[in-house]
């Protein structure tokens, strides 16, 4: 009888040891009070995965003068510990203070840039003085005059309909515009992709060209040389309906991988589109080198090709079976991971993995979920949650850092009401112990 008891006791000891090891491996992170992290309990079914609201970064982007809202919100780490931020549609002007957060007179540049300087600890600085806005101000001298702390669009589309005189007065192109893609540092310069958009009479926001802009990194943030626009190739891709390069991954194999999601009706009777992640790559890390597209042939066999995919090729070239949006790829250990939002406008953000940066990305797990309400005054519910962008340059301890975009039900709700200045601006979240999802 003692041998079965010995076996049972040994199994018990083994299970107990494994449990203790798991508790040690997935211990709660050592947080500092100044980080302003607020736990969101029960956000993930795995008890080791810990999701936090980042109230420090929320406060940094709760702004009342100049930039006071915007979407897009992507970052790129620059030399010297600086962080480059890009925004799409933004509000510039004035909002009231924390007691009411009412957005007042603001204009609406279609893209905008900012640089975050490092703090004394070398991490991205968490003071307002660490934000250097690369804004072309309309005027900042007379608070009673039109255009006070308004801003012009950073990069105009060459087909923009406004005259130079109208632009100087602070008017904004609305028919042809650029939205920001991802960016990377190559040979001491910043290379950035821009998505040309045609906003016709029905506000359809149709994709058009893909441009590449090159910026200087000479000097320091705030100096005339730093992030000076050196060149723009507006016709790098004359027509880019898929939108490759919304996000990038610079791999050790010498290529930069360019991700997008291709949306299409998978079946004739479908009410909603499918959104399939797809990938291209530049031949070298220089984004101006020739691009290759990862495409499946009619038999399902993938290959790299030099020609831009046809709609039929794109439909069969998904690098994940999941229908998602805003794919971000990074590498940790021997695995490549992709984070992405469930399609369409789902509150859930997923993570999946692959052995290569071109996929397939499977083994999909729920990572975190956007709260149903925002931490703001006035109306707290939002209409859409979209573009949860990953910010590796903001991570302190290997956690995953996300910004979110949320809009309000009616355009007028962005103005003149309590809390209106806290729609259409980023909120930030951090996910710790995320790798525990793949040890279940």
Task: For each feature predicted by the language model, list its residue ranges.
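Generic detector of short, well-ordered, non-transmembrane alpha-helical segments enriched
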Residues: 13-15, 71, 275, 350, ...
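Beta-rich catalytic cores
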Residues: 69-71, 177-180, 242-244, 323-325, ...
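Bacterial Sec-dependent N-terminal signal peptides
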Residues: 1-23
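Beta-rich carbohydrate-recognition and catalytic domains
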Residues: 21-66, 77-176, 185-238, 252-324, ...
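Hydrophobic core register within WD40 beta-propeller blades
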Residues: 75, 183, 246-248, 327-329, ...
